[in-house]
Amino acid sequence: MRLILLGPPGAGKGTQAAFVTQHFAIPQISTGDMLRAAVKQGTPLGQEAKKVMDAGGLVSDEIIIGLVQDRLKQPDCANGYLFDGFPRTIPQADALKSAGVALDYVVEIEVPEDDIIERMSGRRVHPASGRSYHVRFNPPKQEGLDDVTGEPLVQRDDDREDTVRNRLAVYQKQTRPLVDYYASWAQAGDGKAPKYRKISGVGAVDDIKARLFQALAS
């Protein structure tokens, strides 16, 4: 099982990815993790990436694809893999295609923007323990206070509504076009094209999981 999960930030991709990797016994491949590992191991690509990052630059798609190809040669990828947060752009998807990286499915988890803003901007955390709450879905017993210590809860900068809206805007501009890219490739009837499936990411976690596994069986 070789797949990509697409969807906006806050769509629940991380939660669903964990179910998929466990079920199919495949690794979740994150470009961030790969970059850190390559830099730490001092591989040729890692050294190249480190130079760019130390200079405050963005690591090129060429280096990223090289890292992906190296990673896919490792034995734990024999049964497949799940790409996490990659590809993010059309040039990356093109490079992946040109490199002959095989894919069985591309699944889009669709969640309306208003739902995502409510999900993310409603999160509150207790910094010392990491306990998390949600003002609507999992509220503390006393508004704004941790259940255990009674200490104030905070909203992380990442969860502020303006930050969430900015992240969604970046997704719409950069990553959303991938949905059309993979959907049209699948429709073109190319035998190498992955199957494209869209599921709703709204509802209970187990319901979304059931939809996802149904999509991967069709």
From Swiss-Prot:
ATP binds at G10, A11, G12, K13, G14, T15, R123, S132, Y133, G203. Residues 122-159 are annotated as: LID. GO terms for biological process: AMP salvage. One of its GO terms (molecular function) is ATP binding. Gene3D superfamilies: P-loop containing nucleotide triphosphate hydrolases (3.40.50.300). Pathway: Purine metabolism; AMP biosynthesis via salvage pathway; AMP from ADP: step 1/1. It is found in: Cytoplasm. One of its GO terms (cellular component) is cytoplasm. CDD domains: ADK. Its main location: cytoplasm. Its EC number is 2.7.4.3. Keywords: ATP-binding, Cytoplasm, Kinase, Nucleotide biosynthesis, Nucleotide-binding, Transferase. AMP binds at T31, R36, G57, L58, V59, G85, F86, P87, R88, Q92, R156, R167. It catalyses: AMP + ATP = 2 ADP. Catalyzes the reversible transfer of the terminal phosphate group between ATP and AMP. Plays an important role in cellular energy homeostasis and in adenine nucleotide metabolism. Consists of three domains, a large central CORE domain and two small peripheral domains, NMPbind and LID, which undergo movements during catalysis. The LID domain closes over the site of phosphoryl transfer upon ATP binding. Assembling and dissambling the active center during each catalytic cycle provides an effective means to prevent ATP hydrolysis. NCBIfam families: adk, PRK00279.1-1, PRK00279.1-2, PRK00279.1-3, PRK14527.1. Belongs to the adenylate kinase family. HAMAP family: Adenylate_kinase_Adk. This is Adenylate kinase. It comes from Bordetella petrii (strain ATCC BAA-461 / DSM 12804 / CCUG 43448).
